[in-house]
A protein has these predicted regions:
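N-terminal amphipathic/basic-hydrophobic helices that include classical n-h-c signal peptides
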Residues: 1-22
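Auxiliary, metal-adjacent structural segments of Zn-dependent hydrolase domains
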Residues: 18-81, 130
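Hydrophobic (often cysteine-bearing) scaffold residues that line and stabilize catalytic clefts
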Residues: 29, 94, 114, 118
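Short pre-active-site segment immediately N-terminal to the catalytic Zn-binding motif
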Residues: 80-96
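Active-site recognition of the HExxH zinc-binding catalytic motif
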Residues: 95-107
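Post-HExxH zinc-binding segment in Zn-dependent metallohydrolases
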Residues: 111-130
Length: 130
């Protein structure tokens, strides 16, 4: 996806304002879900923080193990990477962030990564958040 260039005629009919507002709403949702997870699903006492980075211009991410997905949690960095241009829109983005958040919580609790548990958690967060 490229960037949208506002044309002079767009400024006249208010389209530029709509584009800017849409972008702000998406950003609020994107970071809002991270804030929501931090508040309602924190790690166990004594665990560090996890950083969540949205990779603009990417629709998928290759994990350290070579697998391709929309997001990945990298334990040594305690960092979650999310493809910012993933298909499926807002719901898919929220689901992906929550899925990787669950893997981080599993890591913090010294639990094995459980994909089914992460998927169930992601669905729960989508229902709670939207």
């Amino acid at each position: 996806p490229g960037s949208y260039m506002v044309q002079p005629e767009d400024r006249e009919n208010g389209a530029a304002v709509d584009i800017i507002l849409k972008g702000k709403r998406q950003m609020k949702r994107k970071y809002g879900v991270v804030d929501y997870l931090r508040k309602h699903y924190p790690p166990p006492e004594g665990s560090g923080e996890v950083e969540v980075e949205f990779l603009e211009g990417y629709d998928s991410i290759e994990g350290p193990d070579g697998s391709i997905g929309f997001g990945v949690f990298v334990p040594p960095e305690e960092k979650i990477y999310i493809a910012d241009d993933l298909p499926g829109g807002e719901e898919s983005m929220i689901e992906t962030v929550a899925h990787e958040w669950k893997h981080w919580l599993q890591y913090c609790n010294d639990e094995a990564y459980d994909e089914e548990e992460a998927e169930d958690f992601a669905q729960q967060i989508v229902e709670e958040f939207l």
